[in-house]
Amino acid sequence: MVSFFKTPIFILIIFLYLNEKVICSINENQNENDTISQNVNQHENINQNVNDNDNIEQLKSMIGNDELHKNLTILEKLILESLEKDKLKYPLLKQGTEQLIDISKFNKKNITDADDETYIIPTVQSSFHDIVKYEHLIKEQSIEIYNSDISDKIKKKIFIVRTLKTIKLMLIPLNSYKQNNDLKSALEELNNVFTNKEAQKESSPIGDHGTFFRKLLTHVRTIKENEDIENKGETLILGDNKIDVMNSNDFFFTTNSNVKFMENLDDITNQYGLGLINHLGPHLIALGHFTVLKLALKNYKNYFEAKSIKFFSWQKILEFSMSDRFKVLDMMCNHESVYYSEKKRRKTYLKVDRSSTSMECNILEYLLHYFNKYQLEIIKTTQDTDFDLHGMMEHKYIKDYFFSFMCNDPKECIIYHTNQFKKEANEENTFPEQEEPNREISAYNLYLNYYYFMKRYSSYGVKKTLYVHLLNLTGLLNYDTRSYVTSLYLPGYYNAVEMSFTEEKEFSKLFESLIQCIEKCHSDQARQISKDSNLLNDITKCDLCKGAFLYSNMKFDEVPSMLQKFYLYLTKGLKIQKVSSLIKTLDIYQDYSNYLSHDINWYTFLFLFRLTSFKEISKKNVAEAMYLNIKDEDTFNKTVVTNYWYPSPIKKYYTLYVRKHIPNNLVDELEKLMKSGTLEKMKKSLTFLVHVNSFLQLDFFHQLNEPPLGLPRSYPLSLVLEHKFKEWMDSSPAGFYFSNYQNPYVRKDLHDKVLSQKFEPPKMNQWNKVLKSLIECAYDMYFEQRHVKNLYKYHNIYNINNKLMLMRDSIDLYKTHFDDVLFFADIFNMRKYMTATPVYKKVKDRVYHTLHSITGNSVNFYKYGIIYGFKVNKEILKEVVDELYSIYNFNTDIFTDTSFLQTVYLLFRRIEETYRTQRRDDKISVNNVFFMNVVNNYSKLNKEEREIEIHNSMASRYYAKTMFAAFQMLFSTMLSNNVDNLDKAYGLSENIQVATSTSAFLTFAYVYNGSIMDSVTNSLLPPYAKKPITQLKYGKTFVFSNYFMLASKMYDMLNYKNLSLLCEYQAVASANFYSAKKVGQFIGRKFLPITTYFLVMRISWTHAFTTGQHLICAFDPKGCTADCKNSAPCYKSPESFFFTHALAAEASKYLFFYFFTNLYLDAYKSFPGGFGPAIKEQTQHVQEQTYERKPSVHSFNRNFFMELANGFMYAFCFFAISQMYAYFENINFYITSNFRFLDRYYGVFNKYFINYARIKLKEITSDLLIKYEREAYLSMKKYGYLGEVIAARLSPKDKIMNYVHETNDDVMSNLRRYDMENAFKNKMSTYVDDFAFFDDCGKNEQFLNERCDYCPVIEEVEETQLFTTTGDKNTNKTTEIKKQTSTYIDTEKMNEADSADSDDEKDSDTPDDELMISRFH
């Protein structure tokens, strides 16, 4: 009882004790945490101080940087000097000029001493506002005097004056900080430039802003509701008065010669806070610089007083990598984002709410996005030159690579003096000759770069323009202040705005987005525009939209506005509707050839129009609308041409329909749109090398060729090539990659190397070496014929016949251009080309072809094809396709993608007809059928003329088809917006393995990324290209692999390196899979009636399992009532639908046969060439008394029928025990297999699930036996090797001992010494045992390790004495022995002095008794 009461007290004491310990522990932990937090806070304070100092230092690098100030001053002086010496002496000092500008801040210069005309130039004392007015004067007078002769001079002057204005603006905060040493006052002084105007306008040119926009929206609403107006978009832009096409000069400038109007534009933009954009333009460097300064003033307290947000200068931001630039921007704009290395900025940006983002951050987001694109575009373009860069390289390495290429050394040099810079074609070389580039002067020297820009930039070609911009980019990326200053006058940083027009929308549709933005702003808040907006006030999206509208739509004196001029230029001048069509034809860093360069305000117009014309601009901010707009770039452009999943029969008939209904004059119109030399370039794009008649002699006419002496007649060359592909496919599961097929003996040992996991990817250029040996062998056998030898080798080749000369030329051309030769094929249908063929035979052939195709497909319908070889001249072809692609982009209102392709095809047909001058007109001519249409004196021509004759002969029939195949590959690739992403996808590490896989077509990544096999057959190539790779029995896989190689070359031309490698790796594997798939598909569809019968039976049994009664009484087995539907349920067993034991006995029989067919089919896993050939290797010494089997191809051979039987056994076994699985396979048979898209994905599913189950089943059945056979085979082989080695060691001794002991005394071998030596020496030379050594030998087995290094001679003597030959004078000694002795004589050191006349005796037939080997008793 006492203990009962003590228990709660004891528990209470324990609880209090533990509680105290816990509290103490918590307090200790708290103290520790406080200490840690104090340490952390100390570190944070230190970091904060560093960050604070960093912020201030970053701002000082922009407005307190002495180096920047020095370089800007230097460039300012250079510009002022160049303006004074400029050949264009404008602007002139006219009456009224002094009222426009303060003439005291300008210098006046006379044009000539004899002329009273005076022009003015700015000075160092000229302010920013003075340069603004000076720019207005230059534009006014340039418009008045403009002509094509001075076009480049006007452009250059406008560029440098704009640069001078930018420099004056950049120097304002620099000079202010230098004088006052106050950061904020320097920023405010810059801000006052756009707020404190010298003369405040009393009234706006548009009156009250609110009233103006209300009237505008009412007018827009009226037009949209008016059903009589057809083109509402054009009416919104041009108004009621239709404007005709203006003079071409009117398109060069945004305004006409009216300075007052220019000033009104400046005032409008200042009122809406867009003055900075108006005066600077969309220059990526300058606009970014001032936008960052604007952000610094706006958030000065957070950046530099509260010091809570990180700040970076614009120059520093550009030094970061492309992805880090956005991270830095988010830090400056106080945004929190989650970054994924593999995700695009667009995706991460849109995941975070950016509704409160300031306009400055939006503009910086835009500038960074397109600066990154500008950087990538320049780097991508270098791939067209002799050196390659990639976007992910470190900036230092980009610089080193550039100078290593230009200067042959990573050290800087003056690139304008290097050979790389000078060697661009079609340019006058006026540079001084230097052996070594000058390295004493920096490559970024301000004077040097400005001098060459002013002197020669207008004459630069594409490559030199690229080098100049790339030089500047390397400096920017590596924080070089001189490059930062030099960039201010480079055109590429203005032109980058063109890259933002990517959507395929009409210009009027983009303008409607701007109107929607204004409508949204007007509906949300009806307020008066603040007239004193400045840099400190927020520039809202509404300010941007309304300001952009007024800037682009203001006009005077009924002169068209900027918007109207640009729209007329597109629709009336160029006759296009989409801005993207124009932009795609322009270079991003071009020279002065672009008309926009006449007036930089064109770029300002495009920039403002771009910011306000995104589709979602009315609902989102600028950056969000931009990223939502480019979201379509990730969407696959699915058209009939580009969509590889589009049903091929529909695509084929649609293509033929479009071709048939193309207007006759459309081809003529296309020719007019092309340049004058393009047709000749088209002819030179292809060169035919291997004549079709040459290949036919080894293929179709192979039976006429004489076989080599003692050898059987050779098989057709296409059959041999096809067999090689089939053989590789059969052997690939065991790891016999074809790159080792050069040596047939190595191939037998490759299976052992598979275990070492040394992967050798199947690259086509290695496989081509194997095919080359086969092709050369076939030609060599042809030239070894007796009649060919007599004609070709033993007679003058001048009188040789044309056919033999054509054969020799074809093989010589093939060997010379082996790496570039591609083989195409066409159907060989003689009856189709011969007019003498009766009509009923043609109808019969057509009916047979139809029946053959309907019940399956047209696989193997023809044995032979017309195969020919050619090469592509990639540089010329690329120029042709680029021009045609530009024509298509400019004329999308005339052409669709399909109609343009077919128009080009008809143009190629027209070119093909120009080659038909030497062809007979009658189609019955045998020469026309077999393409022997070379000139009659072909063999008498020289080599160059014969090569031209081969090309003309082949081009007369196959130019159009071959050229169009190459063109469509390039055109459809350029048309698709999916190729960039696809190329990046196959550059990832996980997909590189897919590209090199021998079964890539059964992987999800391969199918998901477009299945390059289906892309080649259904998108990249025209429909007629599928005929030879399906209908030919011999050569279809060979031709398909060449399609892959053509695709590889085309992708390489477009700089898609990963896709190029993918096609090269898959040229054999995917081509084999396609051929095997077609054969299986053909026979599979023949079983439609049988499959349907069993499906109906299965449905009836399913009904019986679920209801107990059969649906169809005919399938009710005997024993049940005749009236099955009215009988009592006797089959009801729902679980039998999933698994049934009733048919287990029958299923086991089929499982048994399935097991043994697997043994035959899977033998390749362990035995190269199969189990049979492996066994035959042990009997190679026995001559095989049988005929040589015909090489196998992808057709209905023994293996195919074994696989068919294997499939039947599998179906009968597993379909019987599981109806659910049977229905699954029925769905595949009836639906999935008939739709290519579903079939490809089912193949992947089948590999990972169904085939996985089959593999596991094989592992416990047939694979066990195959492995046992392999081990037994190797054991027998090793035992055989052991026996051979033992026999090889004993054989020489046994044979000599047998000779000594068994030879009859009466029968003496009358052999001379050298006969004996030669006999035994030859015997010993054939014995090679690799110096194997036997371990653990007993005393009686030691002889196994003895080797005979010399020819043995055995002498048998009596036990008492050994006698020598009577003629041996030097040997008189005797040796006593007790038993038979073996003596080894070194025949090489034998004393030849004893037989001086032996050499003469070798030719004698009489025996030499003195040299006989005799026995003595």
From Swiss-Prot:
It is a single-pass membrane protein; Peripheral membrane protein. Residues 1-24 form the signal peptide. It is found in: Host cell membrane; Host cytoplasm; Cytoplasmic vesicle, Secretory vesicle, Rhoptry. Residues 1394-1411 have a biased composition (Acidic residues). GO terms for cellular component: cytoplasmic vesicle; host cell cytoplasm; host cell plasma membrane; membrane; rhoptry. Residues 1383-1417 are annotated as: Disordered. Pfam families: CLAG (PF03805). One of its GO terms (biological process) is adhesion of symbiont to microvasculature. Self-associates. Component of the RhopH complex. RhopH complex is at least composed of CLAG3.1/CLAG3.2, RhopH2 and RhopH3 with a 1:1:1 subunit stoichiometry. CLAG3.1/CLAG3.2 mediates subunit association through independent contacts with RhopH2 and RhopH3, which do not directly interact with one another. Interacts with RhopH2. Interacts with RhopH3. PANTHER family: 32 KDA HEAT SHOCK PROTEIN-RELATED, CHROMOSOME UNDETERMINED SCAFFOLD_55, WHOLE GENOME SHOTGUN SEQUENCE. Participates in the formation of new permeability pathways in Plasmodium-infected erythrocytes enabling the uptake of nutrients from the blood plasma. This is Cytoadherence-linked asexual protein 3.1. It comes from Plasmodium falciparum. The lineage of its organism: Eukaryota, Sar, Alveolata, Apicomplexa, Aconoidasida.
